[in-house]
Design a protein with these regions (language model features):
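Short, motif-level signal for alpha-helix interfacial/capping segments enriched in acidic residues
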Residues: 18-20, 166-170
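Short acidic/histidine-rich active-site segments
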Residues: 186-189
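Surface-exposed cleft-lining segments at the edges of enzyme active sites
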Residues: 158-161
Length: 192
């Protein structure tokens, strides 16, 4: 079974849609309580066509609306609201979602690069591909935040994916924490 879709109307005019405004009001409630960031799940599924501009357009409107509100309310002096989206796609398709959000989780870096490199002791192409992805992201947002991670609630823990090896899990953590980007550690990942 599945959950019903929320109807935000056309992405280009979603800012006046009652459903959109209700979502914004819910987020403002939490901003008023002191929340300074949000994680958005499955952002490629807001509108059905994952490769059109509808989802990035919606996300840009949502982020811009909330960021303006946040900037007027921030007692902590933060410049911008932090918002990261889960966009489980290859870099080419994912990159345009940076038109909508400042930060996106990078699933490809873990699945295709780090895990392969660590499991196969071969990573000579990893830095070039990583920098190439970041250059692609910059085409859509100059101030993008590359949200790197090893795992999340939809995946096996990194250590499990690495055959249970403590040494490989430590290597994965070292790569995560020393690579460019803003690393995320899914709770419990730090203990294997």
């Amino acid at each position: 079974s599945s959950m019903p879709d929320l109807n935000y109307g056309p992405a280009a005019s979603c800012a006046t849609n009652p459903t959109f405004l209700a979502l914004v009001d819910a987020a403002k409630f939490w901003i008023d309580k002191g929340v300074d960031g949000f994680r958005l799940d499955a952002v490629k599924h807001i509108y059905d066509n994952q490769t059109s501009d509808e989802n990035p357009t919606f996300l840009n409107t949502f982020y811009t609306t909330l960021n303006q509100y946040f900037q007027g309310k921030s007692a902590l002096g933060y410049k911008d609201l932090y918002m990261v989206g889960e966009c489980w796609m290859g870099h080419g398709d994912m990159a345009k979602y940076y038109k909508g959000l400042p930060a996106l989780f990078d699933f490809t870096a873990w699945e295709n690069w780090m895990m392969y490199a660590i499991n196969n002791s071969h990573a000579k192409w990893f830095p070039k591909d990583f920098i190439g992805a970041q250059n692609t992201f910059k085409q859509y947002r100059s101030d993008f935040i590359h949200a790197t991670k090893l795992s999340n609630h939809d995946e096996n823990r990194a250590r499990t994916s690495l055959g249970g090896s403590v040494e490989r899990a430590k290597m994965a953590g070292a790569i995560l924490l020393t690579s460019a980007g803003s690393p995320f550690i899914y709770y419990g990942e730090e203990i294997g």
